[in-house]
Amino acid sequence: YSEIFNPRNQNFRIQKIKPNIILAKKKKNLIMTTPKEFTIGFKENYYFSHMLNCIFDCKYCFLQGMFNSANFVIFTNFNDFINEIKKKTSNKNHKLCFFSGYDCDSLALEKVTNFLKVFLKSFKKINNAYLEIRTKSTNIDVFRNMKPIKNVIIAYSLNPEVIIKKFEQKTPTLKKRINSI
């Protein structure tokens, strides 16, 4: 996928207007260890990305310069991610945390990816792991008619409306974010 997604001499700004979706299978580095200081209180912390790039256009986001491309890569091998998470959690007597949404917004394209539909079912069964879902999206349909899952954390970015308008282009308003909580 990198031959299509991230070659040199692409125009990020032009692609951001109408990005393409690239479906791919991630083959290595499915689950990565976070830096030691990157924790919300767990002994072991990991991150992963089921997708590369974001539909939003936040001016301060490192994704604006991370890749040469504004196209989206959606990894389709969710079971491989889940199997890696299960390996990390097996035979552990302590809680682990897995952060989703490092290279994307975890909820933004849920209607296309079905990422959470798959992952939430799996995390219900993994008693010693937490899943943190990072988002600015109000795309919460996946949670409707579902009982809360005790080991799933939804981390919303909430900023004053003036900051949202100035720096977080294409994102929901503060009111919409709060209403979705």
Q: What is each model feature region?
A:
Residues P35, I55, S157-E161:
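Short connector loops/turns at beta-strand edges and beta->alpha or beta->beta junctions
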Residues K175-I181:
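Conserved C-terminal portion of the radical SAM core fold
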